[in-house]
Amino acid sequence: MKYCRNWHFMSFRSLFLTGNIAEEKFCYHTLPEKLDPYDYEAFKKSHTKFYVGCSNVETGKAEYLPITDMKEEIDRMRASASLPLVSKIVKTAGMKLLDGGCTDSIPVKAFAKMGYNKDVVVLTRHKGYRKEKEGISLTKLVYRKYPEFVKAVYRRPSVYNHTLDEIEKWEEEGKIFVIRPSVPLTIGRME
């Protein structure tokens, strides 16, 4: 909250000046290295496995990238938070990437395949919520060089809703633990 009013943190000004709604240098270097120092060494020494979900714009598939050194692999983190239409594509790990929510919004199946079987799923929407189809004309135009990504964005609502159906089933069966708001939230996507 300390920096949320700083235009470098997130603003349309940053989008127009840098091509990213969240200014890369400020958010991924100045903030964690100087203003609010992140303990990179503690992260590096931790034995906890840490993954970020990204969308490969060339294949239209989700990628789950491990991060073992946050300072050296910060572009993986940046890619996972680079929202389409308001962020530049991030080139890292030999791929062109954007936010993972475009291709796998709730990656419970991906982590089950990795062997994780005690999932805690944190949702930002109330029980019963389902995503409606969205217009993707602008996405088609902006990402016309990446047809597989456009197809993935088009499929996103139905894939997301199917995943929610499975989560509710697994929750009833006691296979996963879900944390979600009890009522619809009245905040916007960027708040």
Which ranges hold each PLM region?
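Patatin-like phospholipase
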Residues: M1-E191
